Amino acid sequence: MNKFTKTDVTPEKLFIQRRKIIQGMSVLSAAAAFPNLAAAKKTEEKRTALSFKADNKPDLILTPENKVIGYNNYYEFGVDKASPAKFASTLKTEPWTIEVSGEVENPMIFTLAQLLAFPLEERIYRLRCVEAWSMIVPWIGFELSRLLEKAKPTGKAKYVAFETLYDPANMPGQKNTLFGGGLDYPYKEGLTLAEAMNPLTILSVGLYGKTLTPQNGAPIRLVVPWKYGFKSIKSIVKIRLTERQPVTTWNQLTPHEYGFYANVNPEVDHPRWSQASERIIGSGGLFTVKRQPTLPFNGYEKEVAHLYKGLDLKVNF
């Protein structure tokens, strides 16, 4: 199996050293991924340093930061990979709240300050897109279960539904259907309650030591590392616990292509391409981008396979 090497991507320690030694390096790195320097500076100025417990996974070498913040899927800001970085600076992230409702004993509204008050930790995770490309990202956040426990799910709660901000004035893809890929907005996603409570599932508020960029889902997003990236909904404003499986955006649009579970599975191909391998973002050169075999559950099989015991994952994809 092909593995990440130090010649493929930049190690975590080198990123930290660069931040400490060269002031403003993150701005310049971001600018390389943006269509114009002004947008890069404006976005970087909004980011603030976070206090968190560091992760230490020497076997996972980070994708270069400029790739992570410059190569995104966020259709609210356009379908091209560079469009979110170009247009997402219009996203207004303050004030911000998340409403938690539905099958809970204690409905709550969390402010951004309250969300940032949760004990934060770094989670270096693999990210696998359904489009057959991958990254390794140092997210900063907290386990979703911590938030749900405060709301106290009732015995009827079986699923957790999520909803992205709806703001057509500042999210051009919501205003223009063609620009936004023809999706039904606001963007919606969902998990089973067991998936949501799994320790790997986090709400992320940052990456690379700072708060999230708008194009990466600021100010708070879901990260579920064993599922395809479209499950990790961005810019969340609503969380609702339900008794029945919630409607989710991509599954509603094309259910034969995007299942509700969307677990990374090299044995279940997308109707239009293979999922057996993945392109490693940030590896090689222009004509030598490397690929590697895709791992079941994106390499997290040991931690999550038990959630699907008795379930045919080729049918329930």
UniProtKB/Swiss-Prot annotation:
Binding site for Mo-molybdopterin: N72, Y75, E76, C129, T164, N216, R221, S232, I233, K234
Entry EC no(s): 1.8.5.-
InterPro entries, per the entry: MsrP (IPR022867), OxRdtase_Mopterin-bd_dom (IPR000572), OxRdtase_Mopterin-bd_sf (IPR036374)
Keyword Ubl conjugation belongs to the record: no
Single Gene Ontology BP annotation: protein repair
Record PTM text: Predicted to be exported by the Tat system. The position of the signal peptide cleavage has not been experimentally proven.
Reactions that this protein is recorded to catalyse: L-methionyl-[protein] + a quinone + H2O = L-methionyl-(S)-S-oxide-[protein] + a quinol; L-methionyl-[protein] + a quinone + H2O = L-methionyl-(R)-S-oxide-[protein] + a quinol
Keyword list, A-Z: Metal-binding, Molybdenum, Oxidoreductase, Periplasm, Signal
Main location: periplasm
Required co-factors: Mo-molybdopterin
Localization (cell): Periplasm
Subunit structure: Heterodimer of a catalytic subunit (MsrP) and a heme-binding subunit (MsrQ).
Family the entry assigns: Belongs to the MsrP family.
Protein name in the entry: Protein-methionine-sulfoxide reductase catalytic subunit MsrP
Organism from which the protein derives: Actinobacillus succinogenes (strain ATCC 55618 / DSM 22257 / CCUG 43843 / 130Z)
